[in-house]
Curated annotation (Swiss-Prot):
Pathway: Sulfur metabolism; hydrogen sulfide biosynthesis; hydrogen sulfide from sulfite (NADPH route): step 1/1. InterPro entries: CysI, NiRdtase/SiRdtase_haem-b_fer, Nit/Sulf_reduc_fer-like_dom_sf, NO2/SO3_Rdtase_4Fe4S_dom, NO2/SO3_Rdtase_4Fe4S_prot, NO2/SO3_Rdtase_4Fe4S_sf, NO2/SO3_Rdtase_FeS/sirohaem_BS. Alpha(8)-beta(8). The alpha component is a flavoprotein, the beta component is a hemoprotein. GO terms for molecular function: 4 iron, 4 sulfur cluster binding; heme binding; metal ion binding; NADP binding; sulfite reductase (ferredoxin) activity; sulfite reductase (NADPH) activity. Belongs to the nitrite and sulfite reductase 4Fe-4S domain family. Gene3D superfamilies: Sulfite Reductase Hemoprotein, domain 1. It catalyses: hydrogen sulfide + 3 NADP(+) + 3 H2O = sulfite + 3 NADPH + 4 H(+). It comes from Methylorubrum populi (strain ATCC BAA-705 / NCIMB 13946 / BJ001). This is Sulfite reductase [NADPH] hemoprotein beta-component. Its cofactor is siroheme; [4Fe-4S] cluster.
Length: 612
């Protein structure tokens, strides 16, 4: 698609400003042609828009900033651009005050996120990633909620070495963050080998098709040759243009009956429609999901995705590009808090959005096909696939792959397994690891290593269905603890649930240190969202399969009071639930909390409707 063609929006005709998208503006009174950055400023667009325009396809001052050895940081503007390269600049907030008192610079480091479509890596790649963790990243890998790895604590002087090592594994970090299509997730259900293969291939195809084409990543991090002339034909972004997308864009591929990728929480999704032999006949397309919001600003809200229509396999890539480019052209580039696709659809309506997608695909979407999701969790332990291969899902608390004193030796154990494993590894959207494609003859050897290193095949029902974001001390947005707090809370809740005979009842619980929603707390039956030190908003009433948003139940609950707040609800659930009724459905039916229909309704009728 031609990113330099003016495209009309439902608001009216667009001005032909290459790369800026369909935003009207008044040119300043001058005889000379205005620059693109001036046009962006004149349009009142967000700072990031003219930052992208002036970046020379995401180069900015990054190369020069890496040479400034007197600081562990990069400039604020380059801190925005480096996200497109898969990194966030962070500092250790545990020691921030101490360093400030001593008049020292913050303890800066970088979080590096990989692009691994579908979350599949080979044993050889695992060993390289393990070596990076032990050499540059504090002896830890972190499996994320979006099916990839993150490294934390990489200092600036080690960035290029780390990137070179990642490249040696035939992996990269391009577009793992930033205003682009990010890492594409795919279903990992190993029991459906054929459907998983189709889902994984679609995820890879979307990732490759929607990948930025700039050579900046290889040039800056691997000392690759710069494209002669800077902006010749090879440097034109054929899909994105110079301003890329208004905001992040997340894509997933799901295979019913499992919704472990949380398809309704993402901008774009594809739901596999299967025949009786588990073969993919096409895909339902979902659009407009997203978790992030801002405390106290009701024009920001989480939203579950709508089902847009059905496409045949040969049209799936066209649909992906069409949806993303409509968001490119219609999305809000003036206010980043309202820039995600969910707000675009709320603003223009699903029918208008569908019509534009169909126009770009060149055909009508078919009506959605029936589908059913049963849960959004993982299947733990061994599972045999249709092809006779075996797959072992391990429970990894908060996705933190490290050796724990007196506990599981995740880093060492998985390294040892990678040395003998003949299949592959798969990450799940619930931060767990699957040792996949194990021949039957190798199961005993894998089992022995799992036992030797104390790796966990499962845990309590509520712990198995828990997710936490990183939060403190590295995330600059965190208002409260999450990963370091949730395990202790789960121990308290396990005691409470056991007292009411609910210890085997699966209940989803997720915690985030801020309302950006990285752990997708607004579609968990119990959601904790940080408000301040040891204070959380408590959300209840989401669907067990991730298809319905929760509702705010209590504001600013102290961490010490969360167990006592939930205990009466557990007691009522144990006493009055119907057969097969999940906790999130029960608290709505029993009248403890209102049901959220979607989007703007999230902020309506909040609080407990009656005492527990």
């Amino acid at each position: 698609m031609d990113d330099h063609k003016p495209i009309d929006t439902p608001d009216g005709p667009a001005v032909d400003t290459p790369g800026i998208g369909a935003h009207r503006y008044e040119a300043p009174p001058t005889d000379r042609p205005i620059t693109e950055a001036e046009a962006a400023r004149a349009a009142g667009l967000a700072h990031n828009e003219h930052l992208k325009i002036a970046s020379r396809y995401l180069r900015g001052g990054l190369a020069d900033g890496l040479l400034k050895h007197a600081t562990g940081a990069i400039s604020e503007d380059d801190g925005q651009l480096v996200k497109f390269h898969g990194m966030y600049m962070q500092d250790d907030r545990d020691i921030r005050a101490e360093r400030t008192k001593k008049k020292l610079e913050k303890a800066f480091s970088f979080m590096i996120r990989l692009r691994i479509a579908g979350g599949v890596v080979t044993p050889k790649q695992w060993l390289i990633l393990d070596n990076i963790a032990t050499t540059y990243a504090g002896n830890a890998l972190r499996a994320t909620t979006r099916q990839t790895f993150q490294y934390h604590g990489v200092i600036k002087s080690n960035l290029k070495r780390t990137m070179a090592a990642i490249d040696s594994a035939l992996l990269d970090t391009i577009a793992a963050c930033g205003d682009v299509n990010r890492n594409v997730m795919a279903a990992t259900n190993p029991a459906q080998a054929g459907a998983h293969k189709a889902a994984l291939q679609l995820a890879k195809d979307i990732s490759d098709t929607l990948l930025p084409k700039t050579g900046a990543w290889r040039e800056i991090w691997l000392d690759g040759e710069r494209v002669v002339g800077g902006e010749d034909e090879a440097e034109v972004e054929p899909v994105y243009g110079k301003t890329y997308l208004p905001r992040k864009f997340k894509t997933v591929v799901a295979v019913p009956p499992s919704n472990e990728v949380d398809i309704f929480a993402h901008d774009l999704g594809f739901i596999a429609i299967l025949d009786k032999k588990n073969r993919v006949t096409g895909w339902n397309v979902t659009v407009g999901g997203g978790m992030g919001m801002t405390h106290g600003e009701t024009d920001t809200f989480p939203r579950t995705a709508d089902v847009l229509g059905f496409v045949k396999p040969e049209d799936a890539l066209k649909a992906a590009e069409a949806v993303m480019t409509v968001q490119r052209d219609w999305g809000n580039r003036k206010n980043r808090k309202n820039a995600r696709l969910k707000y675009t659809i709320e603003r223009f309506g699903l029918d208008a959005f569908r019509a534009e997608v169909e126009k770009r695909i060149g055909k009508k979407l078919e009506a959605p096909k029936p589908f059913t999701f049963e849960n959004n969790g993982d299947r733990y332990g061994w599972v045999e696939g249709e092809d006779g291969r075996h797959h072992l899902t391990l429970y990894v608390p908060s996705g933190r792959i490290k050796d724990i004193d007196g506990g599981p030796q995740f880093l060492s154990g998985l390294r040892r397994i990678a040395e003998v494993h003949e299949g592959d590894f798969r990450l799940t959207g619930n931060q767990n690891v699957i040792i996949a494609n194990v021949p039957a003859a190798k199961r005993a050897e894998i089992d022995a290593l799992v036992d030797e290193y104390g790796l966990t095949r499962g845990a309590s029902a509520i712990r198995r269905n828990s997710i936490a974001c990183v939060a403190l001390p590295t995330c600059g947005l965190a208002l409260a603890e999450s990963e370091r707090y949730l395990p202790d809370l789960l121990t308290e809740l396990e005691e409470s649930l056991a007292r009411h005979g609910l210890q085997d009842e699966p209940i989803t619980i997720r915690s985030t240190g801020c309302p950006n929603g990285c752990a997708r707390p607004f579609i968990s039956e119990i959601g904790l969202v940080g408000r301040g030190p040891e204070r959380y908003h408590l959300y209840l009433g989401a669907a067990f399969d991730g298809s319905r948003l929760s509702k705010l139940y209590r504001e600013d609950v102290l961490a010490s009071e969360i167990k006592d707040t939930l205990d009466p609800l557990f007691a009522a659930y144990a006493k009055d639930r119907q057969p097969g009724e999940h906790f999130g459905d029960f608290v709505i039916r029993a009248g403890f909390v209102a049901k959220t229909s979607n989007g703007p309704d999230f902020h309506e009728r909040t609080g407990p409707l009656r005492a527990a």
